[in-house]
């Protein structure tokens, strides 16, 4: 990532993006970054984002500068925002604010950035000077909304928004070290991501993951269970006592997950942030949808298979099943996923030894 440009020394427009607070949304925001670089050659792009997301931003060649906003979830952090804004004064010509909260628009306003663009939301009339009305029926996907803010308003009225696919860089040297450190084998690897930050109505049953892991090992695969520290117990439930199944939840950094997912042949995943990471490194994705909708936040890749039952009660977008049965995920069988993985494997290129 390039060093920040001193005030007035950048050759093109200086654009600051206030980024989202979730892993998947940050990956999807790369589509906006790619659009800005294509539309404004020579521009310098800075991103204000939670500190945890900086390793992901470092894998995006479009980002010239990533600036950490170290404010806890739900915390206002007035002093932190004000200090950050002061450090940014005079350094940017335009700000694009992706979140719709009032506090998200504070830093660009306090930094006195001349043009401040975002969707109308939470009474931000004084903070943004180019407010856009969000028509959710027209801009019907999160990624479309992000990219639209980087385009002239008139270009997106019909909902036709060109979406470049996110593509995260992979660190081969780091991958080699990870393979050594965690004792990973030469077997073809399948990734599993059992977590979903939103809630249990987005989580495939752990017993299904374990049944699938057992079957995949019997077919000659290695299974890597990936997630954060909160997912460690789930990972242990899947991996316990199984040879060639590695519980890496909470044992790797987010940047490590990028490299490990790129090294997998395929992944089986809930609708989660790591699903979007896997899509952005070109790994084939088997995405499990229960309470959420693939129409709204799909994996941005042509190499994906969506697994959903399309029940009358879904998508409900609830954190926990309002009906108490979560049939939308319970009835997605491990046998269905095994068949899908094996069928896809027959179509994928053979790995070089």
PLM features per residue range, with description:
Residues 1-353:
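Catalytic machinery of carbohydrate-active enzymes
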